[in-house]
Amino acid sequence: MAFRITIDGKNVTHFTSGSITLKLDSIASTFEFSSRFAAQDKEHQEMFKPLQYKDVQIFNSKDKLIFTGTILNHRFKSNRGRELAIISGYSKSGILEDVSIPVSAYPLESTNRSIKDIADRLCGLFGIKVIISDQGKSITDTVIKGKVKSKRAASTKSTYEDLKAKANSIFGRTSASPSESIKDYLAKLASQKNIVLSHNEKGDVLLFQPDLMQKPRYFFTKGNSLEMSADFNGQSMHSDVNIVRQPSDENAGVSTSDTAKNSLIAKYRPTTKILTSGEDTDTKDGALNEVASELKGVQIGVKLQGLFDELYPGEIVNVHNHYIYSYAYNRFMVDSITMNFDESEDTTTLGLVVPESFSGGPVIRNILYNHHDVDNHMELHLNEYNSLYTNDESIL
C-alpha cells in the first residue's frame, strides 16, 4: 500500500482497502479503511477497541503526513473467510462540528474580540490550534509563526497581510446560541469577514484565504484522465449581490450596504442579503463572501488513475477539455481530493472549483471562453512559459 496508517502511534500493518477525502471548504476531512482483525491478538484488541476516539495519522508514499484525525466508528464483520474491522472517522478538528460551547466556558457572548481571539479560546478547549494562513497545508510554503517564507511573491504577502488584518479585526458584540455547534458559530463569524474556515493535515483550524496567484501543480486533459465532468448551476447565481447591514443600537436608523458583482453572469439577476452582526465596514466583505459562495455552483470533477497523494486542497490545477466546456487552459482550485485504494486498483477523484469561490474577486476569470471570443484567456504570468501551460510535464 502507498499509505502508512498509525493508530495512537502504532502502525496498522494489515489494512486492505479504504478511502481518504481531504476537503478545503470544511473544518474536517474524512477517512475509512478496512483491516484484518485478529480477535485473540492483545495488540489488536487494544488498537481496535470501539468508542475510545483514538488518534489516527496517515502518511503518503513519501512518508509525509497528510492527515491527522480521530477514530469515530467501528464496524466488525465475521464470516467463513477473513474477519475485518472497518474503521472510519474525521480530522482532529472535526469534533468542533459535533460539540457546542461547554457550560464551563460561558458566557456565550463575546465583546470587542476578533475571530482569531474567539477561535483560539474555543478551539483551545479541545487542544486544537488556530492558524492564519493562505495555504491549505503546512507541508510546503507554509506561513510559520506569522512570517512568510522569503520565496513567496510580494502579491502573496499582501494577500496574507490582508487576511491577518481581517482575522484580527474586532467584532463589537457576538453571541453563540447554547445549542449551536462551535463550528457553526465560527463559520458564521468567518463569513462576515470573507474568511474561509478550513483545516490542515495536522488537524489545526485554519482562518484561510487562498493564494490565487500560485502556479498550477498539474495539467489535466481528456487524454490523461479517466473521467471529467462539469456542472454549472445557474439558478444559484446572481449578477449583483447586495449586502445590507441591519441598524445597530449604536447606529439606530442607519443601514449601510455594499454590492459585489459576478462577472460570469451577464444577465441581470440581483439578490439582497442581510448582515446581522459585525461592523458597518464588513458589508463589502459580506458581499464578496456571498459571491464566493455562489461561485461554488460551478463544479468540475476529474477522476485519475493512481494516488495523487502529494496534491492538496487549496492548490491550483489546469484543466483543458472541450467536452466539459473548458476551451481555455482554465485554472481551478482543488476543493476536495478523494483517494480510493484497494488490492486491485487505486484512483483519485478531484473536486475543483473556480479559485475566486474562496474570495469573490476582485476579478473573476472568464472560464467560459470559447473559440468565438477574443484570445485573452492565457495568463502567462501565472502559467509556465511553454505550449502546455504546466509546471509538471510528467503527468502528460
Question: Can you annotate each of these PLM segments?
Answer:
Residues M1-K10, Q40-K77, L108-K129, A187, ...:
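Short, acidic/charged, Gly/Pro-enriched secondary-structure junctions
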Residues A2-T6, L108, A187, S191, ...:
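Acidic, small/polar-enriched beta strand-loop surface segments
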Residues F15-S17, S26-T30, I66, R82-L84, ...:
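Extracytoplasmic
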Residues S29-F33, K137, T349-G351:
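Residue-level detection of beta-strand scaffold positions
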Residues S35, G89-S91, Q209, R245, ...:
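Flexible glycine-/small-residue-rich
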Residues L65-T70, I86, R217, G301, ...:
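Well-ordered beta-strand positions in beta-sheet-rich domains
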Residues L84-F232, E393-L396:
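Charged- and aromatic-enriched interaction segments used to assemble
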